Structures are given as structure tokens and as C-alpha cells.
UniProtKB/Swiss-Prot annotation:
Residue runs in coiled coils: none
Family to which this protein belongs: Belongs to the ATPase gamma chain family.
GO molecular function terms noted in the UniProt entry: ATP binding; proton-transporting ATP synthase activity, rotational mechanism
Pfam families: ATP-synt (PF00231)
Lineage: Bacteria, Pseudomonadati, Pseudomonadota, Gammaproteobacteria, Alteromonadales
Name under which the protein is recorded: ATP synthase gamma chain
UniProt-annotated location(s): Cell inner membrane
Subunit architecture: F-type ATPases have 2 components, CF(1) - the catalytic core - and CF(0) - the membrane proton channel. CF(1) has five subunits: alpha(3), beta(3), gamma(1), delta(1), epsilon(1). CF(0) has three main subunits: a, b and c.
Keyword Cell membrane: yes
InterPro entries xrefs: ATP_synth_F1_ATPase_gsu, ATP_synth_F1_gsu, ATP_synth_F1_gsu_CS
Primary subcellular site in the record, as a coarse category: membrane
GO biological process: proton motive force-driven plasma membrane ATP synthesis
GO cellular component: plasma membrane; proton-transporting ATP synthase complex
Keywords tagged on the record: ATP synthesis, Cell inner membrane, Cell membrane, CF(1), Hydrogen ion transport, Ion transport, Membrane, Transport
Length: 286
């Protein structure tokens, strides 16, 4: 058993760690609320844009945009959104596992894959994973802007336009609630059809000035908005996961301190008992 002084030093060390994790928990909670506000603001736009584009994909236009044409998936691209920092539980690990499982299926089907990692952890992982990394972005901060992503996303769009990609997906952690964040893979290109219009499609939009001019701009904007929404959702998920992880660390530190204090008291009691025994033995000898 360690002596009382060593145990006391250990208790002080754990208490200092507990203060740090408690502070990180509070910071993460504050950042999560801000991230939730940004997510709530952008989510209706992204969801409605998805519905509109899904309806367009069901339509019978004379002009067929390349993003509406389904091609054989010989080469698949993934835009993978992760965090820049750690200390957020298994958030990134679970995301990467999902991507790796999907990549395995694509490769078994004979497709080649390439990646566009967003976030330092994603960049680090896919640089060592294998497969072409066509573009990347990191250091976006807690309040990213769409302009920060446009250059990276358009590298993948250019590859799709040139026929170097036949499928394009975005992968991120979808924020469900504070305790639950789910890794998802969503198809960006070719445009997925709207589930609501899958059974019946009895109306269509009127396009002004003409479908080509409108769709050439709208469809690019759609892809950018979906990636941005993925980034915003991932940030909210990151802060929620970090808050939960830091709370667990703080609680564990508290339990460890209690256990160490018990050990300290036993060690102190043993030392006192030893001293008393020595005193009694000395007195008896006299």
C-alpha cells in the first residue's frame, strides 16, 4: 500500500483533472446550444431544398442535367465530415467505421473510391487509410461559413462533371438529441428522388427563364447546402458528445477521489496504529 503522502498527492492530481473536465463540460454545453441554434436555422432550408430537388429529379424535363442522370458506379466519392479535435467519445470512430463498411461494399462491387475529408481527424484518417484524397478542409472552427466549404466541394463537383466520379456521398454525424448522434451516409449525386413523390408524380414546376439556366445554378447550390448542413450537424454532435464525455470523466474522477480518500484514511490509520504500537513496545521495554 502506498503511503499517505503519495495518496494525498494523487488525490490532488485527480482533483485538478476533475476541475479541467468540469470546465470543458460547461464550455461544450455552451457551444452546443449555439451550434443547435445554427443547425435549427439552416435545417429547414436544407430539408426544403432536398424536397424541391427530389421533385425535380422525378420530373420529365426536356433538359436533362448531368446531376440527374444515373450512371454505373465505377468510381465513388465520399465527402466525410469529422471533428478537428478529440475528447468527444466515439463520435469519429463510429463515423469512420460506417464509411469503411460502405467503402468495402463499393470495392467488392468493383468500384474505385476517393475521399474529400473535412475536419482534421478525417484528414488524418484518410491519408493513412488508402484511396485517393482529392481535396480536404480543416480548421473551420465552431461557426463555419458556406464560403469556407465552396472551394473544397467544387473540386468534387468538377470531378463529377468530368466523369471522374459516378456517385457522390456526404457522411456526417446527424444530431438527434444531446445523448444521441447517428453517423449517416447521404447521396448527393446523382440527385436522389423525393420519397414523397416516389409513388405518384402528378405535377411539375414551371421554370423561368428556362430549366437549363435555373438548374445549372440551383443544383450546385443544393450540393453545397447539403454539405454545409452536414458540417453544422456534425459540430452540434461534436459538442454534445464532448459534453457527455466530459461529464462522464468528471463523475469518474469524483468516484476515484472517493476511493482514494478511503485508501488514504486506511493508510493514515495504519500509520497511527504502527506509531502507537512502537510507543507501547518502547514503554514496555523500559
Amino acid at each position: 500500500m502506498a503511503n499517505a503522502k503519495e495518496i494525498k498527492t494523487k488525490i490532488a492530481s485527480v482533483q485538478n483533472t476533475q476541475k479541467i473536465t468540469s470546465a470543458m463540460e460547461m464550455v461544450a454545453a455552451s457551444k452546443m446550444r449555439k451550434a443547435q441554434d445554427r443547425m435549427a436555422s439552416s435545417r429547414p432550408y436544407a430539408e426544403n431544398m432536398r424536397k424541391v430537388i427530389g421533385h425535380v429529379a422525378q420530373g420529365s424535363l426536356e433538359y436533362k442535367h448531368p446531376y440527374l442522370e444515373v450512371r454505373e458506379a465505377k468510381r465513388v466519392g465520399y465527402i466525410v465530415v469529422s471533428t478537428d479535435r478529440g475528447l468527444c467519445g466515439g463520435l469519429n470512430v463510429n463515423l469512420f467505421k460506417k464509411v469503411v463498411a460502405d467503402v468495402k461494399k463499393q470495392r467488392e462491387a468493383g468500384a474505385e473510391v476517393e475521399f474529400c475529408p473535412i475536419g482534421a481527424r478525417s484528414v488524418q484518417f484518410f491519408n493513412s487509410f488508402g484511396g485517393q484524397v482529392s481535396a480536404h478542409a480543416s480548421g473551420l472552427g465552431d461557426a463555419p461559413k458556406l464560403a469556407d466549404l465552396i472551394g473544397t466541394v467544387r473540386v468534387m463537383l468538377q470531378a463529377y462533371n468530368e466523369g471522374k466520379l459516378d456517385r457522390l456521398y456526404v457522411v456526417f454525424n446527424k444530431f438527434v438529441n444531446t445523448m444521441s448522434q447517428t453517423p449517416v451516409i447521404e447521396q448527393l449525386l446523382p440527385l436522389p428522388k423525393s420519397e414523397e413523390d416516389e409513388i405518384s408524380h402528378h405535377w411539375d414546376y414551371l421554370y423561368e427563364p428556362d430549366p437549363k439556366e435555373l438548374l445549372d445554378t440551383l443544383l450546385v447550390r443544393y450540393v453545397e447546402s447539403q454539405v454545409y448542413q452536414g458540417v453544422v450537424e456534425n459540430i452540434a454532435s461534436e459538442q454534445a458528445a464532448r459534453m457527455v464525455a466530459m461529464k462522464a470523466a468528471t463523475d469518474n474522477a469524483g468516484e476515484l477521489i472517493s476511493d482514494l480518500e478511503l485508501v488514504y484514511n486506511k493508510a493514515r490509520q495504519a500509520a497511527i496504529t504502527q506509531e502507537l504500537s512502537e510507543i507501547v513496545s518502547g514503554a514496555a521495554a523500559v
